[in-house]
Every structure is written in C-alpha cells, then in structure tokens.
Amino acid sequence: MRPRIYSINKLTMTSPQIEIQLIAIVVAVACAIPGVFLVLRKMALISDAISHSILPGIVIGFFITQDLNSPLLILLAALTGLITVVLVEMIQKTGLVKEDTAIGLVFPSLFSIGVIMIAKNANDVHLDVDAVLLGELAFAPFDRLLISGMDLGPKSLWVMGVVLLITILLLFLFFKELKVSTFDAGLSSALGFSPVVMHYGLMSVSSITVVGAFDAVGAILVVALMIAPAAAAYLLTNDLKKMLWISIGFGVFSAIAGYWLAHLIDASISGSMTTVLGIVFLGVYLFAPRKGLIAVLYRQRQQRTEVSLLTFLLHLNNHSEENERHLNHLNEHINWQKVRAETVVELGLKNNLITIEKEVVSLTEKGNEFTNLALEYIITNRDEKIEHMKDDFFLFRG
C-alpha cells in the first residue's frame, strides 16, 4: 500500500499519519465518556485494574479460537474486566482492606497469570506483553480491514468507531439514570433505577473500551485517556454535561498534540500522548480558577487574613478604651507580626470597615454592621445574613 500525501497550508501529511491521528481521536473520545463517570464515582483506579487484568481473557480467547482477530477475544477480555471489578468489590466488602489495596491485589495477579500463559503456551504467537502495555499506534494503519478485497481502512479505527457509537448511544439512552446513580444511589433506587445495574453497565462499557483500544494504543495510554481528561475537567466545572465536553476536548487535543510531539522528537506516540495528558492535567491542577492549587492557596491566604480582620473587628467592638484600639496594640497584645498587622489594617481600610485617627483605630458604621452580621452568621449559620458580603470576602464563600 503506497501512502497518499495530503498538504494543508504547507503542512504535509501522509494517509497513515492522518489515520493514526483519527484512531487516537476516536480512542480519546471513547475513553473520555466512561472516564468522567469513573472519576465522579471515585473509581479512577479501576480503569487501571481492568486495562491490565483483561490479558488472561485475551489469551484464553486465543487458545479457544487460535485466531487473534476473533470477536471472542474481545468478549472474554471484557468478561475478565468485569470479573476484576467483582473480585475487587468482594475483597473490599470484607472490610479488611480499602479499595485501592483490593485493586493492588487483584490486577497484578490476573495480569501475571496472563503473562505466564503467554510464556508457557504462546511463545510462537504475536502476543507481545510490551505492546500490550505501551501499544504501537505507528503500526495501527497497516492492520487493514479487508472485505471481498476492498480496503476499508485501519481495523483499529473500525473497532473503536463501533465502540464509540455504542458508548454514545448508551449515554443518550441512560444519561439520566447514570447521573442520578452516580450522585445519589439511594435516590436512584427510590426512582426505580437500579444503581447496581448502572454500576455494572458502566464497568462493561469501560471494559469493552479498554479491550477495543488495547492493541492499538496499549494499556497505559488507555488509562491516561480515561482519567487525565476527566480529572482535569472535574477541576474546571461542576456541570456534568460541560465536564463531558471538556474531557472530550482535552482528550482530542492531547491525542493530536501528542502525535506531533512524537513526530517532532522521534519518540513513542503513545508515550508522547500520555506526556501531553500529564502536562494538560498539571496545568489545570495549578491554574484552574476555583479548584486549582494556586487559587486554593490564594483563597486560604485571604481567608486567614479575613479571619484576622474579623478577630480585630470583634476586638474593637468589645473595647472602647483608646489604648486597646491603638495600632501598637496589634503587635503588643494581639501578638501579630508587623507585616500581618499592616495587611489586616489595609484590608479593613480598603473595605471602609475602620478609620484611623492619631493611630487609634475605630469602627465605621459599615464596620459595626459587618461585625454584627458576622457574629449573627457565626451563631446561626444563616447564609442570607452575609449574602452580600460574599463578593468582597472569601471568608463567607465556603
């Protein structure tokens, strides 16, 4: 097969390059959808367990059919993925270990069983453990789907395309049930949606997705595509539909950017895509507006300052003596460092809560009102009392 060459605005690509990116995009979208629900259910590690433990299913399927292209391999691998989930839950329900420990016990055992089966009984067969882990997208376009001599394109693209269509169809049919069972299993049962059925349905889709992407991209990239985009989206929004779209967007971007990074530095395509996914998540983790590390640290710093301000205002409210309201009192009696005292005073002046005359601090009318409302909020915890303060003060935003 002689590759065709395409040129778009001086960017020259051969047909295998386009097909590699299409396969990566389809895999990214197919992984992002179940990945969102796994992250929301705090089951991110289960995707790693499934991606490794399906190996025995593939090997057993090959022993039965002697055909690496048989659909039975996919079915048995998906079944092995479900068995993994059941085993993890059985161990977890004993109460002796937590979920992450149960996962750590189950998937290495199943994966090693698969490796031993290959080593002992399938040495002459193309079942490469390294390819299972890392995949090799560069070769995916050369495994073609041929029907009656007609070349229909890369087999991986068709397999993952079918998996993606099934995933999207199930998402549309059961979106409401998935949403309710994810956030409130009790309400789901009350409304007649079995959370157990939804749970194992999600696990089945996750298993089939992992199996479908297994040969093309490898276990490591599948896990990265399931978890990293969803985790990044989780830090950016609380809306489920937006989270799905953002997760898909991150996955597609990482697939394309990762391919061109690999092309630029002559490295593993799957490894480069996983690296880009890590960089994307790190960027969101640091700079997300509400949940990012920098935003959280800034908010905590502001809240500490505002707690100090509120403490100072309560002190002023309780003391009318000038010596108790003198600026020097901040350092001597409240035991604040000079920088902290200056920061608190500046915040109070900025919000017109205090005035300073001859280094004696007094509450303004607004300061008196603020202090009384804050006290009432502390006692009653009724949000309506401090609703108008939330725009100016981190302290009351929760």
Regions inferred by a protein language model and the residue ranges of each:
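Transmembrane helix-bundle core of multi-pass membrane transporters
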Residues: 111-170
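Helix-loop-helix "hairpin" substructures at the membrane interface of multi-pass membrane proteins
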Residues: 152-223
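Short amphipathic alpha-helical interaction segments
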Residues: 334-350
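Short loop segments and helix-boundary regions at transmembrane helix junctions
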Residues: 36-127, 234-245, 262-266
